[in-house]
């Protein structure tokens, strides 16, 4: 297909040169066509496609309960809020890891009494 485009451009330039030699002006339409075809020739396929990487965003805001702010409590409120954020992060991590840890079960208390594997 690229060779066909080059051939069309070559034909248009030859035609334009012939008209210029005869003294007549090349038609405006042929100039526009040759200009458009040159633009098409210079373009690379898929050159402007950007591939974005999807990153996992830690979405733990759903787990933070609505807080009623009492400005008279200063230090305790900060500690409580930090605890809530840590708990929310832990919950979100558990939710994200749930498909991977589905079949793992903890060992019972008497596991080593009955285990035959040394």
UniProtKB/Swiss-Prot annotation:
Principal localisation: cytoplasm
Q: Name one GO biological process term.
A: regulation of cell population proliferation
Q: Name one GO molecular function term.
A: alpha-tubulin binding
Post-translationally, this protein is described as follows, namely: Ubiquitinated and degraded by the proteasome.
Its keywords, alphabetically, are: Cytoplasm, Cytoskeleton, Metal-binding, Nucleus, Ubl conjugation, Zinc
Which portions of the sequence form the region Interaction with SIRT2?
30-88
Fetch the InterPro entries from UniProt: BEX, TF_A-like/BEX
- Asked if Metal-binding is a keyword of the record, the answer is yes
- The annotated region (Disordered) lies at 14-50
Q: Where is the segment annotated Interaction with alpha-tubulin?
A: 30-118
Which superkingdom, per the lineage? Eukaryota
One GO CC annotation? microtubule
Q: Where in the cell is it found?
A: Cytoplasm, Cytoskeleton, Spindle pole; Nucleus; Cytoplasm
* UniProt similarity note: Belongs to the BEX family.
Main role? Answer: May play a role in microtubule deacetylation by negatively regulating the SIRT2 deacetylase activity toward alpha-tubulin and thereby participate in the control of cell cycle progression and genomic stability. In absence of reductive stress, acts as a pseudosubstrate for the CRL2(FEM1B) complex: associates with FEM1B via zinc, thereby preventing association between FEM1B and its substrates.
Subunit (UniProt)? Interacts with alpha-tubulin. Interacts with SIRT2.
- Protein name per the record: Protein BEX4
Provide the species name. Rattus norvegicus
